[in-house]
């Protein structure tokens, strides 16, 4: 006699539970304590969050937030972050880091954006920001008709959002077409001083502008306080701005003075507007639709050399090319790595760890760890090291700003048109700094 076998199908019910997003770390939690997102978990998170993101539409309508995040004001950005914090019960979000326009926020790129918030939290916010940008993609009109954007978005913020800065924080490995700029292309098309002037906001996000400059009791440094007015081709000479004083102890070494210079130069560029802005993207530098280049038709009058000629405070026992002054001259906002390197290279006291080799614009990092430490101090990033610094240098390869010298360790060369920008030949700088040709 055979035993009866129960072949009835069974239904297994899996209980689902809401993800506890309060597990997100606080800002003071070490990164090592936070598990990294894997590609598969990121994909699952992306799919799970898309439906929830749709709830932001009602919030946009209620608060009058534009659909295009590149048109957001600082208030809109704050409202968006606050909505996300409440919607997902996010923890550890520092709202001060998001004090910027939507255009500046979108221009950061993923790598820099993720530095604004703890792990997981930054991924959620970035995912939503990307979706919002893709939902509001609008084609440019090139037949003479004006685009549908409001006139107000042709300010410098609009320039930032659709300019070359939009690609600044994306390392070459993240491009979907990594070979869209070849070595031969770089050789045949060196970056011009005008293109160099257009590069902004790479490797860092804009700092919050201080209302009152820091007060210290030593070394005075001039700065320019720019009035909130439209810069036309006739009044773009930066020397027309009113002058003030900013005190800064050990101004080329202290973190506080670095931050104040960043904020002042950020104020300089963010309060400007370019009537002559090239509104239709140019693809001369990039053959990729997500990274259009937009350049102003006019650059500041004269060279940097002319700009600092009458400023005696910049000529005595200081770098020939202070990064803060160069950032102010170019209107680049926060100090950029290439500007910082030029400051160190034109400071005699730094020749023990970074110096010109004597061969044109070639330079060597004799102590790369010290260079990285100072860059981290300048940007208030104590975890900065040479590995991270070198990633920033590699980013410059495709931009034709800096190239690595083949066969030489820690040796690089500026390949952009520095002479037109600075007004100095490399030989002039070498003579001023008593540079002896490298024996290697």
UniProtKB/Swiss-Prot annotation:
Cell compartment(s), UniProt: Nucleus; Cytoplasm
Region (Helix H5): 426-432
UniProt xrefs under Gene3D superfamilies: Transcription Factor, Ets-1, Winged helix-like DNA-binding domain superfamily/Winged helix DNA-binding domain
A single BP term in Gene Ontology: regulation of angiogenesis
Region feature (Helix H4): 418-422
Activity regulation behaviour: Autoinhibited by a module composed of four alpha helices (HI-1, HI-2, H4, and H5) that flank the DNA-binding ETS domain, reducing the affinity for DNA. Phosphorylation by CaMK2/CaMKII in response to calcium signaling decreases affinity for DNA.
GO MF annotation: an example: sequence-specific DNA binding
Domain PNT: 51-136
Residue segments, region Activation domain: 130-243
Effect of residue 251 to A: Decreased phosphorylation, leading to decreased autoinhibition. Strongly decreased phosphorylation, leading to stongly decreased autoinhibition
Entries under PROSITE patterns matching the protein: ETS_DOMAIN_1, ETS_DOMAIN_2, ETS_DOMAIN_3, PNT
Residue list for modification Phosphoserine: 251, 254, 267, 270, 282, 285
Region (Helix HI-2): 323-330
Crosslinked residue numbers (Glycyl lysine isopeptide (Lys-Gly) (interchain with G-Cter in SUMO)): 15, 227
Gene Ontology CC terms, in alphabetical order: cytoplasm; nucleus; transcription regulator complex
Outcome recorded upon mutating residue 270 to A: Does not affect phosphorylation and autoinhibition
DNA-binding region: 335-415
In-chain residues carrying the UniProt-annotated modification Phosphothreonine: 38, 265
Acetylation listed as a keyword: yes
Site of covalent link Glycyl lysine isopeptide (Lys-Gly) (interchain with G-Cter in SUMO2): 8, 15, 138
Family classification: Belongs to the ETS family.
Quaternary structure, from the entry: Binds DNA as a homodimer; homodimerization is required for transcription activation. Interacts with MAF and MAFB. Interacts with PAX5; the interaction alters DNA-binding properties. Interacts with DAXX. Interacts with UBE2I. Interacts with SP100; the interaction is direct and modulates ETS1 transcriptional activity.
Name of the protein in its database record: Protein C-ets-1
Originating organism: Mus musculus (Mouse)
């Amino acid at each position: 006699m055979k035993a009866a076998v129960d072949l009835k199908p069974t239904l297994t019910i899996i209980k689902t539970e809401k993800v506890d997003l309060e597990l997100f770390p606080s800002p003071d939690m070490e990164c090592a304590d936070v598990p990294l997102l894997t590609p598969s978990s990121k994909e699952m998170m992306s799919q799970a969050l898309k439906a929830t993101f749709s709830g932001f539409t009602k919030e946009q309508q209620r608060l009058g937030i534009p659909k295009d995040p590149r048109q957001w004001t600082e208030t809109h950005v704050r409202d968006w972050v606050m909505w996300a914090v409440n919607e997902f019960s996010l923890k550890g979000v520092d709202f001060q880091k998001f004090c910027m326009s939507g255009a500046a926020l979108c221009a950061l790129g993923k790598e820099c954006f993720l530095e604004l918030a703890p792990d997981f939290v930054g991924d959620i916010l970035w995912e939503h920001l990307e979706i919002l940008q893709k939902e509001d993609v609008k084609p440019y009109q090139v037949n003479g008709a004006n685009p549908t954007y409001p006139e107000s978005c042709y300010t410098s913020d609009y320039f930032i959002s659709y300019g070359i800065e939009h690609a600044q924080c994306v390392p070459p490995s993240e491009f979907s077409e990594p070979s869209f700029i070849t070595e031969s292309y770089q050789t045949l098309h060196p970056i011009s001083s005008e293109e160099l002037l257009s590069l902004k906001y790479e490797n860092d996000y804009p700092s919050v502008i201080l209302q009152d400059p820091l007060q210290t009791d030593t070394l005075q440094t001039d700065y320019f306080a720019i009035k909130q007015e439209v810069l036309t081709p006739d009044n773009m000479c930066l020397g027309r701005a009113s002058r003030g004083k900013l005190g800064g102890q050990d101004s080329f070494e202290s973190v506080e003075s670095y931050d104040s210079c960043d904020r002042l130069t950020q104020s300089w560029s963010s309060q400007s507007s370019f009537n002559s802005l090239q509104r239709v993207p140019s693809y001369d530098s990039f053959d990729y639709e997500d990274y259009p280049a937009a350049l102003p038709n006019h650059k500041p009058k004269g060279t940097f050399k002319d700009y600092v000629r009458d400023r005696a405070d910049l000529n005595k026992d200081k770098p020939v090319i202070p990064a803060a002054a160069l950032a102010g001259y170019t209107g680049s906002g926060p100090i950029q790595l290439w500007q910082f390197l030029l400051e160190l290279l034109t400071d005699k006291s730094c020749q023990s760890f970074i110096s010109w080799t004597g061969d044109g614009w070639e330079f060597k990092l004799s102590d790369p760890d010290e260079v990285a430490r100072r860059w981290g101090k300048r940007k208030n990033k104590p975890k900065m090291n040479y590995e991270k610094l070198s990633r920033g240098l590699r980013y410059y390869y495709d931009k034709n700003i800096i190239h690595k010298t083949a066969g030489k360790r820690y040796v690089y060369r500026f390949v952009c048109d520095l002479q037109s920008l600075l007004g100095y030949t490399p030989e002039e700088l070498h003579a001023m700094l008593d540079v002896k040709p490298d024996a290697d």
